[in-house]
Amino acid sequence: MNNFKSTALGLVKWIGLIALSLLINAAPMLFLRLGKNLPIYAEILLVALYLILVYLIFRSLWQRYQKRVPEEKKKFKLSGKDIGFAFLFFFFARVAAIAGVYLNLILSGNSQTSNDSAIQGLGGMMSSQHIFFALLFVATIAFIAPIMEELIFRGFGTAFFFKNNQKVLPAIVTSVVFTLPHITQLTEFPIYFALGLVLYLSYARRGNIKDSMLVHILNNL
């Protein structure tokens, strides 16, 4: 019974964190769409408030996540070897993405996923008149989203439900959950599921979420 309660509570927390991640990712997109007529001072204020809020949220979540990480893993740092592995996993992620794009093209006739098309559409809305919103949008795609998604999907997703010696089940579960918010069609599932598996493997190599954060950042740059 206690195990069921713990799992149910973990599920509620995880869903809440995923919703938080989606809101953080969506805010800069809303700024671009709805902030066309805002004066420059309002734009700067919104960007500053967003960055402060994201920093406070991340710091709070990171502190809570660290309580679930074994002491020996807290001391792990990124060495040259680890950066090399990150680029290797990044290569695997690109191969998986290219294969997934071709599969999506065969199955649906679309050469891009709906998520990529939406991002490119928003990118086309960027202008020098709203440079701060544009820079925030780029920073979110390249850095903020990868860091928050790794902490929430793979970090907390693994910590809430799985033991340290479990690998296959958490890889599948976290990759499926990571995939669902990123797709609008089933034909897009293999692309993001494969990316999720690569990101999980980069994390599971030594149990350091910073590794998958780096791979995810490289993939989004």
Language-model segments: what does each one mean?
Residues 34-50, 132-137, 165-174, 184, ...:
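Membrane-interface starts of transmembrane alpha-helices
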Residues 46-54, 140, 191-199:
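Hydrophobic core segments of transmembrane alpha-helices in multi-pass, intramembrane catalytic enzymes
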Residues 1-103:
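N-terminal, membrane-interfacial amphipathic/helix-forming hydrophobic leader that caps
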Residues 11-15, 44-45, 83-88, 123-145, ...:
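Hydrophobic alpha-helical transmembrane segments
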Residues 105-130:
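Membrane-interface interhelical connector segments
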Residues 26-29, 172-175, 179-183, 187-221:
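Functionally important transmembrane alpha-helices
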Residues 148-173, 201-211:
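Membrane-interface helix/loop boundary segments of multi-pass membrane proteins
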